[in-house]
Regions:
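Structural and coupling elements of P-loop NTPases
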Residues: 11, 17, 24-25, 30-649
């Protein structure tokens, strides 16, 4: 075989190791084949779909280990695919990642998808890159709402699923019932007969085995899963391999060395570095023309520069400055854009403002509206589920997304980068239909809870204008409650639910549709304690205020007038002085100088604070602190604007 044909595979003669080929052909022998033995590698593209915490990323780690992507002596971090700090801390996958393994002479490109509906914008894009999907389901929990969200998208684009029942060793496993639930789910999502005839595997991603029988054998590792992928998933459906180059951008990232890097599957033709390309928008308009500086292919968890890529392979290209997600990257001779997957609209919005508190600029180094604007628009470039709008005054920005989790992750990321900003309470995106009726987003909510706590859950959900559609036992003295509830009623309910159920409830949400406005929902029952002066909080003053309600600050913490320092025990706001020191006298008496014992404060996490604040309050976020404050810091301004709001109502 001539060398040029060898390079089409992405291989170069010196890089081929005998260990890899020995592994692929099953001999384990350490030999390097002659050039004539190397064939153009076949390709399979698959996505792994699963709910949060059902073991998707762990399974990918095991696939990488067992297919020889790591050396035997290489130390490998757990959950290799979750490379983002926030992903590791929260235990969720936020960004879609691509990797590849080689099995029996076939390159299997695997895409790890986010399982959370807030990050569904990623999911829809990557489904257009793959030809099959592994639906990973927990043997105890069964298919969950987010599984339904992604599976529905996958079935709609015609993917043929493989169902893998994971965590089969769980003592509360019920794999037979779960298989029936999966079948019912597929049927309810209008799956075709071919899609309903899905193969099933059982196993444990953590222990590194899968088999067609729940009891094993376990000594074959994940080989049955990889073999099934080769049999069941079709080869990439590509256009003309010798035709003009065309590719849809599905993932976007900014690289400090390469600039914009676009990942996608090549639809037709081939591409080489330094080749001229143009970028078409969805309506066929030319966005830019340029040259490809580098082509990167996924090999294991590494990205390797290659000399040529062909139709069907998933690659990343660099060298263009304007092309983005859902655009068509193509040869200059192409005139029509490829059709891209539509993306669901955002449902929640919030305001990002320049931090104008008296403590602004003391803890972060990125505080101006210009750097905040640049950072938000840069985020929106790579995250199509986000929408950014500027206010008229240019000092605040309206950021819309899929849910408060997605926005909280963005705020936490910016905070770690050194930004200081103020953010408002999340608000729901409403719109009017053709008759002028106000419509609001409704979500399907599934809550698994112990039977003894089901009453309080139903009561709290009905207060939030939710309608219960289903109540059924889910095994182990637990019940599954299904509601349709307005999105605005669910903001902040997660922490309250955990308190009501002593941490035993699991809540999952999924966007359902838009329905007519359900009416007002009562908000927070308590008022707040506001500092009336600026300085450092004093333990003596805080001790004397404990009867007024719990504090959310500690002694010695810097405060300013208008900052929230505690939760009032009544429903009105109260201004207090937390700076008042003990009166010093020269008269001594027994027991006067005892140490002050304070009740520990309630610490507000970012997620909790976002949902706790009201419409007239802001959360001040800095790299070191999270502070809560009133929108108007001056007491007279608050009274004046409060009266104006009442008059408008």
């Amino acid at each position: 075989m001539p060398l040029s044909q060898m390079q089409k595979t992405g291989y170069e003669r010196p890089k081929v190791t005998g260990a890899v080929f020995g592994f692929i052909n099953g001999t384990g022998m350490d030999f390097a084949p002659e050039p004539s033995e190397i064939l153009i590698m076949k390709i399979r593209n698959i996505a792994i779909i699963a709910h949060v915490d059902h073991g998707k990323t762990t399974l990918v780690d095991e696939l990488l280990k067992q297919s020889g992507s790591f050396r035997e002596n290489q130390r490998v971090a757990e959950r290799v695919m979750d490379s983002n700090d926030l992903e590791k801390e929260r235990g969720i996958t936020i960004l879609a990642k691509a990797t590849s393994v080689e099995w029996k002479g076939v390159r299997v490109n695997i895409v790890d998808t986010p399982g959370h509906a807030d990050f569904g914008g990623e999911v829809e894009r990557i489904l257009s890159m793959v030809d099959g999907a592994i639906v990973l389901v927990d043997s105890s929990e069964g298919p969950m709402p987010q599984t339904k969200f992604v599976v529905g998208k996958a079935l709609k684009v015609g993917l043929r699923p493989i169902v893998a029942i994971n965590k089969i060793d769980r003592p509360d496993g019920r794999h037979e019932e779960v298989i029936n639930e999966v079948f019912d789910l597929f049927a309810s999502l209008d799956a075709t007969d071919e899609q309903l005839d899905f193969p099933i595997l059982y196993g444990s991603g953590r222990d590194g085995w899968m088999n067609i029988a729940p009891e094993g054998p376990k000594d074959q590792g994940l080989a049955p899963l990889l073999d099934l992928v080769l049999q069941h998933v079709p080869e990439p459906s590509v256009g003309d391999e010798d035709g003009a180059f065309r590719m849809i951008g599905t993932l976007l990232e900014a690289n400090p060395f390469l600039g914009r890097v676009i990942t996608g599957r090549i639809h037709s033709g081939s591409i080489k570095p330094n080749q001229s390309v143009k970028v078409l928008s969805q309506d066929g308009k030319v966005i830019e023309t340029g040259r490809i500086s580098k082509i990167l292919a996924f090999r294991g968890i590494e990205r390797t520069a290659i000399d040529e890529a062909h139709a069907g392979d998933i690659v990343a290209i660099a060298g263009l400055s304007k092309g983005t997600v859902a655009d068509t990257f193509c040869d200059p001779s192409v005139t029509e854009a490829l059709e891209a997957q539509p993306i669901d609209p955002p449902t929640v919005t919030m305001s990002f403002l320049v931090n104008d508190s008296p403590l602004a600029g003391t803890e972060g180094d990125k505080v101006t509206s210009r750097v905040i604007r640049d950072r938000l628009f840069k985020e929106a470039e790579g995250n199509v589920a986000l929408k950014i709008e500027e206010s008229e005054g240019k000092d605040s920005f309206f950021v819309s997304g899929r849910g408060e989790l997605q926005l909280a992750v963005l705020i936490e990321t910016m905070r770690r980068e050194g930004f200081e900003l103020a953010v408002s309470r999340p608000r729901v995106v409403m719109h009017k239909d053709e008759n002028g009726t106000l419509m609001e987003p409704i979500e399907e909510v599934v809550i698994d809870v112990d039977e003894e706590h089901s009453g309080v859950v139903v009561q709290k959900m009905s207060e939030r204008k939710a309608e219960m559609t289903e109540l059924r036992p889910s095994g182990g003295n637990r019940v599954r409650l299904v509601f349709y509830a307005p999105t605005r009623g669910l903001i902040g309910y997660q922490s309250e639910l955990l308190t009501d159920t002593r941490g035993t409830a699991i809540m999952n949400r999924l966007f359902h549709n838009y329905q007519p406005f359900k009416g007002e929902i009562s908000g927070r029952n308590n008022g707040v304690l506001l500092s009336n002066q600026s300085g450092e909080a004093v333990a003596y003053a805080m001790f004397n205020l404990e009867d007024r309600g719990p504090m959310i600050i500690e002694p010695g913490e810097k405060v300013y007038a208008g900052m929230i320092v505690g939760i009032h025990s009544r429903d009105n706001d109260l201004e207090v002085n937390v700076l008042k020191g003990k009166q010093l006298t020269n008269i001594r008496s027994a027991g006067k100088d005892e140490a002050v014992k304070l009740t520990p404060p309630i610490r507000m996490t970012l997620d909790r604070a976002l949902s706790w604040i009201q419409d007239d309050e802001l959360m001040e976020v800095t790299p070191k602190s999270i502070r809560l404050r009133k929108f108007y810091l001056d007491a007279n301004d608050r009274k004046r604007f409060g009266k104006a709001r009442v008059a408008q109502a």
